Amino acid sequence: MKIGVYGASGRIGKLLLEELKGGYKGLELSSVFVRQKCETDFSSFSHAPLVTNDLKAFVRACECVIDFSLPKGVDNLLEALLECPKILVSGTTGLEKETLEKMQQLALKAPLLHAHNMSLGIMMLNQLAFLASLKLKDADIEIVETHHNLKKDAPSGTALSLYETCAKARGYDEKNALTTHREGLRSKESIGIAALRGGDVAGKHTIGFYLEGEYIELSHTATNRSIFAKGALEVALWLKDKAAKKYEINEMFG
């Protein structure tokens, strides 16, 4: 399958290019979208990709787009994909409501998956969090996430995704149960998220389930950002023969 990388100059974008250099599990890098000059030397790649700032040409040259860019960039990408539908794997966070609506429109034409975190470990953490939230009905739930000091959004998209998982399991009102700034007494039907920023931490997420006399913590730590690139490529492979629809990352576990 031919892969197009959108957001190739970013941290994860560069890792995607590195993973695709020798052809990841039969995937071929066919196109790279860049706004300015691309620093990557493609002479060592098994196939020389199209490197372009022409969005329509970029989309035409691939069968699947993997996106790790910025919210505005995703909006532009979706406009092009609505004209020329291709499989989409998107890991960009902080998307506006209008952009998410365009994603739903594309899902009528092509398979797509949008996730805040592409690591297999986070996929499993989500499933464990759902089970713990469901079974430990009297436990207070708190989420702590830690990232590098250059991360722009807080709380992280992954932390919000974990919150949604826990709130859904409990039957909480997802719009009102979230607390990111705590003052005074804790309300029973609330889930808190604390965001820490410092150093070069790739990502750590911990969910605590606090009971009387004991507590359980479920934690995931990313020690290498390559897991996000590999995870996105695995998602692309999984979507290859799927019908047009917006898929959830937990569906990969069957």
From Swiss-Prot:
* Functional summary from the UniProt entry: Catalyzes the conversion of 4-hydroxy-tetrahydrodipicolinate (HTPA) to tetrahydrodipicolinate.
What keywords would UniProt list here?
Answer: Amino-acid biosynthesis, Cytoplasm, Diaminopimelate biosynthesis, Lysine biosynthesis, NAD, NADP, Oxidoreductase
Q: Give the pathway annotation.
A: Amino-acid biosynthesis; L-lysine biosynthesis via DAP pathway; (S)-tetrahydrodipicolinate from L-aspartate: step 4/4
Q: Name one GO molecular function term.
A: 4-hydroxy-tetrahydrodipicolinate reductase
The protein's name is 4-hydroxy-tetrahydrodipicolinate reductase
Q: What is its EC number?
A: 1.17.1.8
- The residues that hold (S)-2,3,4,5-tetrahydrodipicolinate are 148, 157-158
Q: What is the lineage of its organism?
A: Bacteria, Pseudomonadati, Campylobacterota, Epsilonproteobacteria, Campylobacterales
* Family of the protein in this entry: Belongs to the DapB family.
The entry's NAD(+)-binding residues are 7-12, 91-93, 115-118
| UniProt keyword Amino-acid biosynthesis present | yes
Q: Give me the reactions it catalyses.
A: (S)-2,3,4,5-tetrahydrodipicolinate + NAD(+) + H2O = (2S,4S)-4-hydroxy-2,3,4,5-tetrahydrodipicolinate + NADH + H(+); (S)-2,3,4,5-tetrahydrodipicolinate + NADP(+) + H2O = (2S,4S)-4-hydroxy-2,3,4,5-tetrahydrodipicolinate + NADPH + H(+)
Cross-referenced CDD domains: DHDPR_N
Q: Which residues form the active site?
A: 147, 151
Per UniProt, subcellular location reads as: Cytoplasm
> What is a single cellular component term in the Gene Ontology annotation?
cytosol
Report the source organism.
Answer: Helicobacter pylori (strain Shi470)
Q: Which annotated residues bind NADP(+)?
A: 35
Report the record's Gene Ontology biological process terms: diaminopimelate biosynthetic process; lysine biosynthetic process via diaminopimelate
